[in-house]
Swiss-Prot record:
Residues 1-19 have a biased composition (Polar residues). The gene is NMBR. This is Neuromedin-B receptor. Keywords: Cell membrane, Disulfide bond, G-protein coupled receptor, Glycoprotein, Lipoprotein, Membrane, Palmitate, Phosphoprotein, Receptor, Transducer, Transmembrane, Transmembrane helix. The modification Phosphoserine is found at S352. It comes from Homo sapiens. Glycans are attached at N8, N16, N192. Pfam families: 7tm_1 (PF00001).
Amino acid sequence: MPSKSLSNLSVTTGANESGSVPEGWERDFLPASDGTTTELVIRCVIPSLYLLIITVGLLGNIMLVKIFITNSAMRSVPNIFISNLAAGDLLLLLTCVPVDASRYFFDEWMFGKVGCKLIPVIQLTSVGVSVFTLTALSADRYRAIVNPMDMQTSGALLRTCVKAMGIWVVSVLLAVPEAVFSEVARISSLDNSSFTACIPYPQTDELHPKIHSVLIFLVYFLIPLAIISIYYYHIAKTLIKSAHNLPGEYNEHTKKQMETRKRLAKIVLVFVGCFIFCWFPNHILYMYRSFNYNEIDPSLGHMIVTLVARVLSFGNSCVNPFALYLLSESFRRHFNSQLCCGRKSYQERGTSYLLSSSAVRMTSLKSNAKNMVTNSVLLNGHSMKQEMAL
């Protein structure tokens, strides 16, 4: 639909009661359709960026899931959640990104009523899986660092799989209203030409989009991030307190342990930071449009902001494997070995501990005199004391 101008357009079917143009559909348009340099550049550059996002995202996330599935040492509670993130990203990359890219080649909605109902549900489900999984990961890091005695390994993987499935169920249920209200409508211009478009909430009043955008921002952004912030506040406080309280003669031993804990928490925090950076502009833009329901901004600046927000939000689906590659030595080694087609899969010696605090049973014996914590690790039935690192 990019070739349609924003001016002289109206909704002839599926219009809201006030007769105003529904929020949402105008974001798919370029400012003009006269073959200008701007239009031609956008038609080429944006789909190319989408193709890059799809290619890189599929490679990284498929490799991530494959590594966790094929290497038993990598199967842990945090890694199950990370695989859940990758699955949600793959869903978005395989469905929503190609559909969005097609809008720069075709003047009309090409995916029918079913596609109009399904695509918004898939996108919101993917966002829900991402932010709710990040919240669950933060809770896991909180328990591992602040309350290590509460970490139980008996049935932990099974319980985590159930939690991951629960995240999907909740995300799908929350996205169902998108399918209920989205409709394919025909947009008419004053020159008697018309085209079809997928419009969210076309038959509602001005209040509905405002409520919807605020709820989306709260449920899928602000509230989860507030919970994550609380978890990380307590994590930071515990790490600082532990560094001050541990006796000097054990500094070398505890330093490695502390670095491991901080590294694990850092990985999750980087994931959260990437999510905020990529999705915040999209949330703000959606609320801006919802609160300016009757106005259409045909300016080049608004169009550029819209395109940047879209590219950033879709780009979030390919950044997590890169972050993990940079921050985790174990994942980096396994990833490199997978890329080397002629080599055997890298078999890691010793204990792999990529976010695997729950893959082992840890019991803490606290000394009242020296406030020292000694971890006794049980792995495959054998007791061993060691410092585990990425």
